[in-house]
Amino acid sequence: MTSGGKSKGVGSEPGVRVIAENRRARFDYTVDEKVEAGLALTGSEVKSLRDGIANLSDAYALPKGDELFLLNANIGSYKAASFFDHLPTRGRKLLMHRGEIDRWTAKVRERGYSIIPLVLYFRNGRAKVELGLCRGKTHEDRRHDIKERETKREMDRAMRRR
């Protein structure tokens, strides 16, 4: 029998520190694929992330030319940077292999997928983002997910009572 608790994810590995999660994305979208990407950041952005000042709730990624950019990700300003501070919601270049960028860009352009950031974290001192290739859920899909979750809870309760 398996033990309770969280499933193995990004934050359960050694050397990984989760900064921000996009919990709303898992409710609004069906995630078909995931990939890890690096971020091109300024020094004040890295320091803000180390302080945990980030929000991914409205963020998404878009292809521009041969590159992918993370847009609307809010990395708060770093107090000590004053003059050299960054814009909180500026576009940030995503660092991925050329083949991955081309494959994901093709899927986004032809099949109605979106690229949504799921988790922002540090892995061995480097800022990374877990991106999901997502398709929007319909109202019926959301209801189905809620119903599945409820039946699973009821089964767990029944098993504990035995």
Curated annotation (Swiss-Prot):
GO terms for cellular component: cytosol. Keywords: Cytoplasm, RNA-binding. It comes from the Bacteria. Signal peptide: none annotated. It is found in: Cytoplasm. Residues 140-162 are annotated as: Disordered. CDD domains: SmpB. Disulfide bonds: none annotated. InterPro entries: SmpB, SsrA-bd_prot, SsrA-bd_prot_CS. Its main location: cytoplasm. GO terms for biological process: trans-translation. Required for rescue of stalled ribosomes mediated by trans-translation. Binds to transfer-messenger RNA (tmRNA), required for stable association of tmRNA with ribosomes. tmRNA and SmpB together mimic tRNA shape, replacing the anticodon stem-loop with SmpB. tmRNA is encoded by the ssrA gene; the 2 termini fold to resemble tRNA(Ala) and it encodes a 'tag peptide', a short internal open reading frame. During trans-translation Ala-aminoacylated tmRNA acts like a tRNA, entering the A-site of stalled ribosomes, displacing the stalled mRNA. Belongs to the SmpB family. This is SsrA-binding protein. It comes from Myxococcus xanthus (strain DK1622).
